[in-house]
């Protein structure tokens, strides 16, 4: 369907399709520590899905498509959540900076993302074309 963009499709189906594309291409550089890491300080366990790095990369690429100029700090805010403190009140906790940084570096290696002159990262025209092609 011509003219279909990432904004027009269901986000969950798109992220799954993009993650499958990234895994099938085999070009995404996955760190060796992916099976032992938690994704945030507020998480109790590591992710159950063994392909979580591809899913996180797809989700990050989608976020950069929708709002470019996001860096490591804003990605930690996006993937943050509620920190439970037992009997004390809950507070917001950010996601892992190391995971966000490695995902952005891996997407830079695929030439989907580049550093923005105003700070943060943005999608390259090639990356935007890939995302629109997968959405269609």
From Swiss-Prot:
List locations, semicolon-separated.
Cytoplasm; Nucleus, Nucleolus
Q: Give the Omega-N-methylarginine positions (modified residues).
A: 67
| Residues that bear N6-acetyllysine | 23, 111, 115
Positions of the region Disordered?
116-136
User: Which terms does the record give in the GO molecular function aspect?
Assistant: RNA binding; structural constituent of ribosome
Q: Which PROSITE patterns match?
A: RIBOSOMAL_S19E
**GO BP of this protein:** ribosomal small subunit assembly; ribosomal small subunit biogenesis; translation
Top-level lineage group = Eukaryota
Record keywords: Acetylation, Cytoplasm, Methylation, Nucleus, Ribonucleoprotein, Ribosomal protein
Q: Please provide, in alphabetical order, the Gene Ontology terms of the cellular component aspect for this entry.
A: cytosolic small ribosomal subunit; nucleolus; small-subunit processome
What InterPro entries does the record tag this protein with?
A: Ribosomal_eS19, Ribosomal_eS19_CS, WH-like_DNA-bd_sf, WH_DNA-bd_sf
Major localisation: cytoplasm
Q: Does the keyword Acetylation apply?
A: yes
Quaternary context: Component of the small ribosomal subunit. Part of the small subunit (SSU) processome, composed of more than 70 proteins and the RNA chaperone small nucleolar RNA (snoRNA) U3. Interacts with RPS19BP1; the interaction is direct and mediates the integration of RPS19 in state post-A1. Interacts with RPS19BP1.
The record's comment on protein family reads:
Belongs to the eukaryotic ribosomal protein eS19 family.
- Protein function: Component of the small ribosomal subunit. The ribosome is a large ribonucleoprotein complex responsible for the synthesis of proteins in the cell. Required for pre-rRNA processing and maturation of 40S ribosomal subunits. Part of the small subunit (SSU) processome, first precursor of the small eukaryotic ribosomal subunit.
Protein name (database record): Small ribosomal subunit protein eS19
From the broadest rank down, the organism's phylogenetic lineage runs: Eukaryota, Metazoa, Chordata, Craniata, Vertebrata
């Amino acid at each position: 369907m011509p003219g279909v963009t990432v904004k027009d499709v269901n986000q969950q189906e798109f992220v799954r399709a993009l993650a499958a594309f990234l895994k099938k291409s085999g070009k995404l550089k996955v760190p060796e520590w992916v099976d032992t890491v938690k994704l945030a300080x507020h998480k109790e366990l590591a992710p159950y899905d063994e392909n979580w790095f591809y899913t996180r990369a797809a989700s990050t690429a989608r976020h950069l498509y929708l709002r470019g100029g996001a860096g490591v700090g804003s990605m930690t805010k996006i993937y943050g959540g509620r920190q439970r403190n037992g009997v004390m009140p809950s507070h917001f906790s950010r996601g892992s900076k190391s995971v966000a940084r490695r995902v952005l570096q891996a997407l830079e290696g695929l030439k989907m993302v580049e550093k923005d002159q105003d700070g943060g990262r943005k999608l390259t025209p090639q990356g935007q074309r890939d995302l629109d092609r997968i959405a269609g």
